[in-house]
C-alpha cells in the first residue's frame, strides 16, 4: 500500500500497535514514506480507531474488510490451481489471523467450481496460534455461532489478532469445503518454521502454523496418508528476522513458559560458529557438520 501510494503521489497512513510489529515489516512502510503511527494498544485497538477515522476523514480503508483486497488475494488460489493443472489437492491449509486470506482463497475455490474449472473442492483448513485463537474457540465452543474477542498473545505477530474482521466469511468457507480449524503452540510454530527453512523455503512465524497444524491434523486422522496437501505461506522469512536469529541462537523462549520444553528444538537450531581465521579450523568445522548431517 505504501509503495503504491508513493508511486501515485498519494499520502499513506499505517496504524500499528506499539512494539508488536517486527521491524522487518515496519521498515517497508517507513522507507516508502508512509505516516507510520505506533498506537499504545493492540491490533484490534488500531482497527477500532481506523474504523472511526474513515467516518470522519476522506481516508480509503485497505485492510481485509476491503472487498477489493479479497478479490486480489483470490489470485493465490487461482494460480495454485492453474499450476496443478486444475486438479485440486485434497487439502489446503491456511494461517488464521484476521482471516482475510482464508476468506479469499475459499471464495476463489467456490467460484472456480461454479465455473467448472475444478470438479471438486479441496478441504480448506485454518490454523491459529494457541495464544490468538478466537476463531478456533468460536468453532469448537460455539459451533461458529459467535466469536468472543480476546487479548491475543503470540510471537507470530502477523496473526496476533483477537477479533478477526472476516470470521463470518471464513466460517462459510470452512463449512462449504468441509475443512477444519486447529490451534498450535509457540514451540510447535518455531519448530515448524525451522523445518520449512531447512527445506530451502523460509517463512515468517505466522506462516509456519500451517505445517505445525498439518502435523496435528495428521495425528487426528483428518488428513490421511497419501492425500495431497498444499500449505499456504503468507509471509517472507525476512519479515521477522529477529525471531529466526533468536531461535537459532537458543534464547527465543528464555523467560517464557516454553523455556524448559524448548530443549527439544535444539536439533533444529543452527547457530553461527565462531572460529579463528584458520583454514584448518574451517575444514574441521565443515567435516563435523557433514558428519552431523549425514
Predicted features along the sequence, with ranges:
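Glycine-rich phosphate/pyrophosphate-binding loop at beta-loop-alpha junctions
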Residues: 2-9, 19, 28, 32, ...
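A glycine-rich helix N-cap at a beta->alpha junction
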Residues: 10-46
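Hydrophobic beta-strand scaffold residues
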Residues: 12, 36, 60-61, 181
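Active-site/ligand-binding loops adjacent to catalytic centers
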Residues: 41-58, 68, 111-203, 247-294
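Glycine-rich phosphate-binding loop signature in dinucleotide/nucleotide-binding domains
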Residues: 56, 84-88, 223-224
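Conserved acidic residues
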Residues: 59-60, 90, 124, 227
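A short glycine/serine-rich beta->alpha loop
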Residues: 63, 90-92, 196-202
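Claisen-condensing/thiolase-fold acyl-transfer catalytic domains that form or cleave C-C bonds
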Residues: 186-242
Amino acid at each position: 500500500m505504501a509503495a503504491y501510494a508513493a508511486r501515485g503521489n498519494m499520502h499513506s497512513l499505517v496504524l500499528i500497535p506499539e512494539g508488536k510489529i517486527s521491524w522487518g515489516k515496519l521498515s517497508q512502510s517507513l522507507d516508502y514514506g508512509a505516516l507510520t503511527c505506533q498506537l499504545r494498544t493492540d491490533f484490534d485497538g488500531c482497527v477500532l480507531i481506523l474504523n472511526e477515522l474513515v467516518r470522519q476523514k476522506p481516508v480509503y480503508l485497505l485492510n481485509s474488510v476491503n472487498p477489493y483486497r479479497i478479490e486480489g488475494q483470490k489470485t493465490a488460489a487461482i494460480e495454485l490451481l492453474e499450476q496443478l493443472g486444475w486438479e485440486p489437492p485434497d487439502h489446503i491449509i491456511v494461517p488464521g489471523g484476521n482471516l482475510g486470506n482464508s476468506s479469499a482463497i475459499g471464495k476463489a475455490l467456490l467460484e472456480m467450481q461454479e465455473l467448472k474449472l475444478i470438479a471438486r473442492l479441496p478441504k480448506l483448513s485454518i490454523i491459529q496460534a494457541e495464544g490468538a485463537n478466537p476463531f478456533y474457540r468460536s468453532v469448537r465452543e460455539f459451533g461458529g455461532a459467535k466469536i468472543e474477542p480476546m487479548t491475543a498473545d503470540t510471537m507470530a505477530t502477523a496473526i496476533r489478532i483477537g477479533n478477526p474482521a472476516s470470521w463470518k466469511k471464513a466460517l462459510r468457507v470452512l463449512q462449504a469445503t468441509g475443512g477444519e480449524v486447529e490451534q498450535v503452540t509457540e514451540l510447535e510454530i518455531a519448530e515448524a518454521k525451522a523445518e520449512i527453512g531447512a527445506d530451502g523455503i523460509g517463512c515468517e512465524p505466522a506462516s509456519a502454523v500451517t505445517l505445525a497444524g498439518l502435523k496435528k491434523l495428521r495425528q487426528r486422522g483428518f488428513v490421511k496418508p497419501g492425500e495431497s496437501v498444499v500449505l499456504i505461506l503468507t509471509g517472507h522469512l525476512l519479515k521477522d528476522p529477529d525471531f529466526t536469529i533468536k531461535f537459532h541462537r537458543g534464547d527465543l523462549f528464555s523467560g517464557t513458559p516454553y523455556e524448559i520444553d524448548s530443549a527439544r528444538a535444539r536439533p533444529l537450531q543452527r547457530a553461527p560458529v565462531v572460529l579463528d581465521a584458520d583454514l584448518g579450523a574451517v575444514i574441521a568445522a565443515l567435516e563435523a557438520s557433514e558428519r552431523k548431517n549425514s
